[in-house]
């Protein structure tokens, strides 16, 4: 359930497969879209009015590439250490494939939302997560790339976040959260590496 102040909005899970009719006229989705922005492309009055935002950050971590990659690819563990991740589940994974589907429930304060992402990866090289459908975003893509650091057993990790809200209201509401989201993610993954592989915790620019 999504809550804002005294307003209570029934939460709908954003699991829409290709080819499904998303032009829903009644019910929870209709009410949510009217408040936060419709994802019906046929409605010209509800086309994107918010800007696409890109944030990037590069850090050198004191762990080898395979260890850093191993922590970030385990999406099902995110709920254990990412502050804004309330739940994380693998929905579909095929053997010997370089992709899987995961559902994340994220939130800040009284606002919570679940969405499904398709995660594509190449071992020890990159991980890209794309939200397949969510009532909050027109676009949400998170990409990680990895290479060996300048000293042995270190990793240069580059994180890129691209997002576009469906509603100016929600963009304003979540602006401060997303402004610090990369710092939060990278520091959380660094601490997770400490828990699994070591005891010290530091970043080098």
From Swiss-Prot:
<protein>
    <recommendedName>
        <fullName>Coenzyme Q-binding protein COQ10, mitochondrial</fullName>
    </recommendedName>
</protein>
<dbReference type="GO" id="GO:0045333">
    <property type="term" value="P:cellular respiration"/>
</dbReference>
<dbReference type="InterPro" id="IPR023393">
    <property type="entry name" value="START-like_dom_sf"/>
</dbReference>
<keyword id="KW-0496">Mitochondrion</keyword>
<comment type="subunit">
    <text>Interacts with coenzyme Q.</text>
</comment>
<keyword id="KW-0999">Mitochondrion inner membrane</keyword>
<comment type="similarity">
    <text>Belongs to the COQ10 family.</text>
</comment>
<dbReference type="Pfam" id="PF03364">
    <property type="entry name" value="Polyketide_cyc"/>
</dbReference>
<dbReference type="InterPro" id="IPR005031">
    <property type="entry name" value="COQ10_START"/>
</dbReference>
<dbReference type="GO" id="GO:0005739">
    <property type="term" value="C:mitochondrion"/>
</dbReference>
<comment type="function">
    <text>Required for the function of coenzyme Q in the respiratory chain. May serve as a chaperone or may be involved in the transport of Q6 from its site of synthesis to the catalytic sites of the respiratory complexes.</text>
</comment>
<keyword id="KW-0809">Transit peptide</keyword>
<dbReference type="InterPro" id="IPR044996">
    <property type="entry name" value="COQ10-like"/>
</dbReference>
<dbReference type="GO" id="GO:0048039">
    <property type="term" value="F:ubiquinone binding"/>
</dbReference>
<dbReference type="GO" id="GO:0005743">
    <property type="term" value="C:mitochondrial inner membrane"/>
</dbReference>
<keyword id="KW-0472">Membrane</keyword>
